[in-house]
Curated annotation (Swiss-Prot):
Highest taxon of source: Bacteria
PANTHER family per record: UPF0235 PROTEIN C15ORF40
GO CC list: cytoplasm
InterPro entries linked: DUF167, YggU-like_sf
Signal peptide: none
Protein name as it appears in the record: UPF0235 protein Neut_2146
Disulfide-bonded cysteines: none
Phylogenetic classification of the source organism: Bacteria, Pseudomonadati, Pseudomonadota, Betaproteobacteria, Nitrosomonadales
Pfam family, one: DUF167
HAMAP family membership: UPF0235
Similarity remark: Belongs to the UPF0235 family.
Length: 99
C-alpha cells in the first residue's frame, strides 16, 4: 500500500506518523510505510488530531467534515480518510520540495 491509496469510491487513505509539539505544522517526508507530519499542536485533549484535520483539509482543498480519523486517535501512527479530495497526495510532496 505504501503511505497512501485510493479506495473504490476514490477517497484517499493516508497512513501517517505524527510528531506533535513541533515548531510548525508541515509534512516532512516518508517514514517507513507512513508519511511523517510535524504538528505545532500539543498531544493533549485532541488538539493534535484537530490540527492534523485542519492541515489536511487545507492541503486537499476539502471541508473539514471530509477528513475522518479512521485509526490512531491516541497514537502517533494514524490512518486518515479524505472523502473525495480535490488534490492528490502529491500536494504534500510539493510542500516538502518547496523548502
Amino acid at each position: 500500500m505504501g503511505w497512501y491509496c485510493l479506495d473504490r469510491d476514490h477517497n484517499l487513505i493516508l497512513k501517517l506518523y505524527i510528531q506533535p509539539g513541533a515548531r510548525q505544522t508541515e509534512a516532512i517526508g516518508v517514514h517507513g510505510e507512513e508519511l511523517k507530519i510535524k504538528l505545532a499542536a500539543p498531544p493533549m485533549d485532541g488538539k493534535a488530531n484537530r490540527a492534523l484535520a485542519v492541515f489536511l483539509a487545507k492541503r486537499f482543498n476539502v471541508p473539514l467534515k471530509h477528513i475522518t480519523l479512521k485509526w490512531g486517535a491516541q497514537s502517533r501512527h494514524k490512518v486518515v480518510e479524505i472523502y473525495q479530495p480535490v488534490n492528490g497526495p502529491e500536494v504534500l510532496f510539493n510542500e516538502i520540495r518547496a523548502e
